[in-house]
């Protein structure tokens, strides 16, 4: 056990003995996400570095504090990538934070999310024990896949120290098509395209308030073999008139979209500046939602963003639930505030009991990121 790992382990054991809450933190790029930030800071950035990388095996293992940008740069040198496009939000994003937050970028609906690429993890539980789950190969899992359990847990179950991930080759060709089309027709067309052998990778529908006439635009990104991408562009523009964008323009736009840096994600100016950014996760086949708020739609209809006040939570959550989804208050109106509005949709009692039992098993003293997922967790 190296010095950094030993120090962190000792700190956890002391905190458990003294019932001192700890706030786990890597680069802090996702401090805005979740409920409250409670406890003494436990800096995990000393746990950094890529410990194993086998390009031929499509597997990389990195310590939790490794900068995400560093990992992606190393993969790019070998023509490989994290296919789920994890958002950075800020320069300090780390591999551990990526897994703990469980957030994926524009390609999520086509390639899968973070949990689909996690092969194994090492973590320190609330007893100060170093545990290993999973490994460095893809295999059928018999029993509970604890590695993936850590994805999206926001550090509430343990301190991630090392993560093994599946990586993929960068697609040899890419194209972005843009169509002027209203929301209902865009969703219907995406569903039709989704049932065809097309190399769909990402999509985004938005009403462009910055352009004359406020056009409603659908952007579709294709990735795959050159012949497949070119053929798809021809087929799709024959069905629906559209334009192929220059990759030099589209590429930076998709990166900005991944990190929520597009103009849509700038908080609208209102008299009290009390609008929050909400994320509605719904089935791709969900229809146009009857909501009085402008939306940006991605994941071929499966994720819908909008700005609304905290008071809209009942409407948003009921609307999402009616179509089989849920709503998350992603960014609060004021930085560092939580207020009375729950960030995440409250769990049903049976599921909440499972969460509580898992918390009691991994973190019996309740010291890790207390109340980050919910006030009672």
Question: At which residue positions do the language-model features occur?
Answer:
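Conserved glycine-rich FAD pyrophosphate-binding loop
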Residues: 3, 35-37, 243-377
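Anion (oxyanion) recognition and catalysis
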Residues: 16, 76, 194, 320-321
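Residue-level signal for inorganic ion chemistry
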Residues: 26, 220, 306
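Short acidic-glycine loop/turn motifs at beta-strand connectors
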Residues: 37, 55-56, 125-127, 208-209, ...
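Short active-site-proximal "capping" loops at secondary-structure junctions
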Residues: 27-32, 37, 47-49, 67-68
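Short, conserved charged micro-motifs
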Residues: 69-71, 184-189, 227-234, 285-292, ...
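C-terminal substrate-binding/cap subdomain adjacent to the FAD-binding core in PCMH-type
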Residues: 100, 119-269
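N-terminal glycine-rich flavin-associated loop
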Residues: 1-22, 44-91, 99, 103-136, ...
């Amino acid at each position: 056990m190296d010095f950094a790992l030993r120090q962190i382990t000792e700190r956890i054991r002391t905190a458990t003995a003294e019932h001192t809450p700890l706030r786990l933190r890597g680069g802090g790029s996702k401090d805005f996400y979740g409920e409250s930030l409670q406890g003494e800071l436990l800096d995990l950035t000393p746990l950094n570095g890529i410990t194993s990388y086998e390009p031929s095996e499509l597997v990389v293992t990195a310590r939790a504090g490794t900068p995400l940008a560093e990992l992606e740069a190393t993969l790019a040198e070998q023509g490989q990538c994290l296919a789920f496009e994890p958002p950075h939000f800020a320069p300090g994003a780390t591999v551990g934070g990526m897994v703990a937050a469980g957030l994926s970028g524009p390609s999520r609906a086509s390639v899968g999310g973070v949990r689909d690429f996690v092969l194994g993890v090492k973590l320190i539980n609330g007893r100060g024990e170093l545990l290993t789950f999973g490994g460095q190969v893809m295999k059928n899992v018999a029993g509970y896949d604890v590695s993936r359990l850590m994805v999206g847990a926001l550090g509430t179950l343990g301190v991630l120290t090392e993560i093994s991930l599946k990586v993929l080759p960068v697609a040899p060709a890419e194209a972005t098509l843009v169509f002027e089309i209203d929301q209902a027709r865009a969703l219907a067309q995406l569903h039709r395209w989704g049932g065809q052998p097309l190399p769909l990778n990402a999509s985004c529908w938005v009403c462009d308030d910055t352009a004359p006439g406020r056009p409603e635009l659908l952007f579709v990104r294709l990735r795959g073999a050159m012949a497949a991408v070119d053929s798809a562009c021809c087929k799709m523009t024959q069905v629906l008139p559209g334009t192929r964008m220059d990759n030099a323009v589209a590429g930076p736009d998709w990166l900005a979209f991944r990190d929520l840096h597009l103009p849509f994600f700038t908080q609208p100016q209102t008299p009290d500046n009390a609008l929050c950014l909400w994320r509605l996760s719904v089935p791709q086949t969900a229809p146009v939602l009857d909501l009085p708020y402008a939306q940006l739609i991605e994941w071929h209809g499966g994720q819908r963003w909008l700005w609304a006040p905290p008071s809209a939570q009942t409407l948003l959550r009921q609307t999402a639930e009616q179509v089989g989804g849920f709503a998350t208050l992603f960014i609060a109106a004021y930085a560092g505030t939580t207020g009375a509005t729950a960030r995440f949709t409250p769990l049903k009692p049976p599921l909440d009991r499972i969460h509580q039992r898992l918390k009691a098993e991994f973190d019996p003293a309740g010291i890790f990121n207390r109340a980050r997922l919910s006030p009672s967790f």
